[in-house]
């Protein structure tokens, strides 16, 4: 997720030259730059390309109208408005809740601005990542070693044979490094519902408007059996569809 859209050019040197410098600085930071034709083109791109991580635009030309339209698609997406010293700032407290930052058109400031945009991008990715996923990403990134899990030692064991290398290349290193068990305390406990597991369950409940949510293993089948055994104790009379999922048959 490294795509930043720039709205422009504007046909005047004092705006286009700083943005040109910024484009080079952003590329050096590892970003991919795109130039939408207009606001409609930009909104369609955001709608169909969730990998975009920021939009740069001229405040005098687009102002809050564009921000509001983007917010309808992604309220967390960082927006970078460039202004001149005479720009009119008509922003309410409600508007400031947007992920909106302001910069002035200035030569020689591109590197510093690009670094700040990298920081804001990292904050954006951190904000949209669910708790357990974030903890798992951190665990893999830190390249920690556990004696008992995973048994294949982050995938290195697969690279001892030609067919093992094919398997490793197919799934990728992160898949195997993230293959961990309950012994990894940094990820909390699925049995005790603690740590990132608990945070994830609370996050799921908030997302779906539930009072409580639980993460279980073995997919929908096990989930159905757990709910069914709670809702229909021994001796209950059940009426189920003939073509129901096999998990309900297992429940019976």
Regions found by a protein language model. Name each.
Residues 30-38:
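Short hydrophobic/Thr-rich beta-strand motif most characteristic of the beta2 strand and flanking loop
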Residues 101-194:
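N-terminal "arm"/small-domain region of PLP-dependent enzymes with the aminotransferase-like
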Residues 2-26, 55, 252:
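Conserved acidic segment of CheY-like receiver
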Residues 64-74:
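Short amphipathic alpha-helix used as the core "switch/output" element in two-component signaling
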Residues 37-53:
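Acidic, metal-coordinating helix/loop segments flanking the phosphotransfer/catalytic sites
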Residues 172-222:
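Conserved N-terminal alpha-helix of the aminotransferase class I/II PLP-enzyme fold
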Residues 212-236, 240, 246-250:
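Conserved beta-loop-alpha segment that forms the PLP phosphate-binding cup at the N-terminus of a helix
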Residues 55, 59, 76-91:
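A short, hydrophobic beta-strand element within the central beta-sheet of small alpha/beta folds
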């Amino acid at each position: 997720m490294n795509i930043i859209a720039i709205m422009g050019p504007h046909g005047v040197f004092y705006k286009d030259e700083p943005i040109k410098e910024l484009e080079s600085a952003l590329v050096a930071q590892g970003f991919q730059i795109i130039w939408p034709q207009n606001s409609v083109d930009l909104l369609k791109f955001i709608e169909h390309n969730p990998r975009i991580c920021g939009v740069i635009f001229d405040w005098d030309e687009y102002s809050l109208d564009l921000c509001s339209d983007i917010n309808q698609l992604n309220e967390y997406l960082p927006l970078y408005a460039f202004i001149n010293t005479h720009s009119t700032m008509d922003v309410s407290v409600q508007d400031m809740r947007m992920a909106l930052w302001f910069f002035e058109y200035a030569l020689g400031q591109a590197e510093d601005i690009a670094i700040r945009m990298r920081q804001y991008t990292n904050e954006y990715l951190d904000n949209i990542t669910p708790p357990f996923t974030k903890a798992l990403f951190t665990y893999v990134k830190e390249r920690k070693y556990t004696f008992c899990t995973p048994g294949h030692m982050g995938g290195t064991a697969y690279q001892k044979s030609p067919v093992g290398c094919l398997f490793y290349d197919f799934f990728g290193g992160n898949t195997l490094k993230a293959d961990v068990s309950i012994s990894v305390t940094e990820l909390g406990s699925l049995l005790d519902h603690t740590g990132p597991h608990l945070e994830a369950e609370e996050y799921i409940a908030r997302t779906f408007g539930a009072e409580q949510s639980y993460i279980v293993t073995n997919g929908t089948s096990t989930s159905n059996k757990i709910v069914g055994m709670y809702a229909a104790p021994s001796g209950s009379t059940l009426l189920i569809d003939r073509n129901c999922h096999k998990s309900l048959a297992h429940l019976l």
